[in-house]
Structures are given as C-alpha cells and as structure tokens.
Amino acid sequence: MKSVTRLANLFRPTHYDLSITLHREARTFEGVVTIQGELFVDDEIRLHSKGLTIHSALIDGKEAALSHDPHDELVLLQQGLIRGSHVIVVSFSGGITDTMNGVYPCYFEVNGEKKEVLATQFESHYARQAFPCIDEPEAKATFDVTLTTEKNITVLGNMPIASQREENGALVTTFETTPIMSSYLVAWVAGELQKKTATTKDGVEVSVWATHAQTPGSLDFALDTAVHCIEFFNDYFGVPYPLPKSDHVALPDFSAGAMENWGLITYREIALLVDPEVTTLSAKQYAATVIAHELSHQWFGNLVTMKWWNDLWLNESFANMMEYVAIDALHPDWNIWLDHAAGEVISALRRDSLDGVQAIQTDVHHPDQISSIFDPSIVYAKGGRLLRMLQAYMGDDDFRTGLTSYFTKH
C-alpha cells in the first residue's frame, strides 16, 4: 500500500477554535474552524477532510482556492503563500451517520419512547469526518470548542463548561480550552443523561453518565472505581491527573469496549455499568479493568502521545499492564493477575506462535492499515506482559521512577 504524506510535516497547528451546530433530526451538522499554525512549505496548506462539504476557506483573512486530494486531503491555495505562521478559517458541513465513527447517534428507549444521544468516535483517523484538521497524533494543539444543540439536554466535552446560554431556540455550550492534545482525542456527547458525581482527594470532579434507560444504582460501582483509580495513578506515576474533571459515559451504541477521549471517556454500557441486583464478580472485574485501562490512557497516550501509529504499543501495552496493577492494588482479594495469566497471556502466546504474526511495534504507511494493528493479543497482551517482566526485572521503585521521568520529559 502506497505511503501517504504526513501532513504534520507540512503544517503544524497550534490552536483550533471549533464551532459546530448539530442538527440531530436532520442528521447533519455545520461548523466553522479557525486554525492557527506554522507552515513549513510554500504555496499551499493541506488539511485532512473526509466526507465534509467545504463552503469557504480563508488564509490570513484572504480567500483561498480549494482542491481535494484522493487521500482525504483538502488543499488550500493562495498566491504568494509562504512558510511561517498563518491563520486559517474554514466553513464546512457534514453528515451524522450510523457508522459509529465521526459524529453518530446512539439509540435507546425510555418507557417505550425512542430517544437518541449524539456521540463521537475519532480514533484513529475519524476527526477529519467532523472538522478539517491535521488528523495525526503528533499534531497536538489546544482546542476551544463550542457546540450548538437542541435545548434541555446534557452537553459534554473534553473540558468543563465555560459558558452556556440559550440563543434562537437552541443551546450554545462553550468549553474551557484544552491542554495540547491530538485530534483523535477530541470528543463530545449530547443528549438526555443522568449522572452521579464524586471528587478525588486532589479535587478532580469524577462523573459517571448513562441514559435514563439504566437504573441509577448501576452507576455506583463505576464511580467508586474511577475515583480510586485516579487517586492510585496520581500516586503511582508521581504526575497528577492533568484535567479538572473526568467524565465516564455509557453509550447505548459503541463499536469497541471504550475510548480514552481526554476528560470524556466513552464506553459500551456493559463495560461501565454494573447492576448491583444481578451482577456477577466477573462482570465487576471486567468493568473495573476497562475503567482502569482507559484512565491509564489519560497519561499513556493523552498526556504523552506517540508520533505515529507504529508506536501504538506505547499507548496500549502500558495501559494493558497498568489496568492490572491498579485493580490488583484496589482489590487484592480478586487475584487479578491470575486472570491475566490464564487469559491474556495464553492468548498472546497462541497468537505469537503463528507464522507472520505482527510485532509489537509495526510500521504503518497508510491510515487504512491502522485498524489492523489494534491486535489485542499482541499490542495489548504481549506488550503488557513484556512490560510486567521489565517491572519485575527493574523493581517497582525504579520502574515508577522511570515512568515519572517519561511523563515529565515528554
């Protein structure tokens, strides 16, 4: 497969100001994105854009000509454009689809009434389906996000709400500015939700959200687990959780187990909610390890991010290991490492015995190859086990010192 050009080498955003209006019933959205960044070539600026209709584009306040490249690229042309700092403004629109990536609806019923929640899934390269951007992990920037939605619903983003107002019969929600982050970690959820909230001893507000189709008691275990996991990782890593809040949202429709969007983690309902009336120990263990895995990603992947997808193991292998470290500390009576040895380790050994199996670190030349490297037996289980061996060889104190240095330097 032909390698694609890495656009972050041509133009590097430093800040996005993104404003999107969601039309849930019409299954469309429109928006304007202002991108500040540094151009490293002359004559053109290339952005990722897929399935979007581009209405206009300005570079430094002057109209730019538009063209499209086959590789999800929007090309902005302007006579006399030279390398250096520039401000781009792009007006666009797109569709809300049932693909469970980009911007998509989740369906549920309450007392026989059909309802929907709108959510996003941008990993690995689906942010480009929601707004023009440099949709590569190393192109980290800050984001200001404003969403215009229908009234009388909950609207969540990566950061706490900075302001919210009603305007022309709609709800306008503006979020606080994010730290520098990759486009695949941007997220929002909009719909009728219930929540339960607690605060860590360091003042991080933790909330678990679900639709009203779920019983309120099913949120309790997740909330307790999330609070204690954040407190554990703060101590273990020696680097505090970087955001003021941590939202955990159970979605009725979700393509994976969970997604570590910074400050707004989304889950399949079974991976977050535990009904105390009917649950089993294995269900609690599954939810606990998924929550710990995603919270570990708030450091591994979100705070420190791989430059490109060939180093996905830096995200997933560490998170796989740390989910067990955390849950073993919180629930030593579960003997969770025995489950790891009997399940994931055996899976890794079986997968690794096959001819042609991928390595933990695998070259990726095209976005279409990314999904194939999310191999649970290799990048997750084998990589996690190797790191567990490294921890045992180094000793836990030195291992933790190394992690603190890793987070601090990168």
Give the location of each predicted region.
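Acidic/His-enriched low-complexity segments
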Residues: M1-K245, I270, D275, D375-I378, ...
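Hydrophobic alpha-helical and helix-loop surface patches within well-folded domains
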Residues: F175, S207-H410
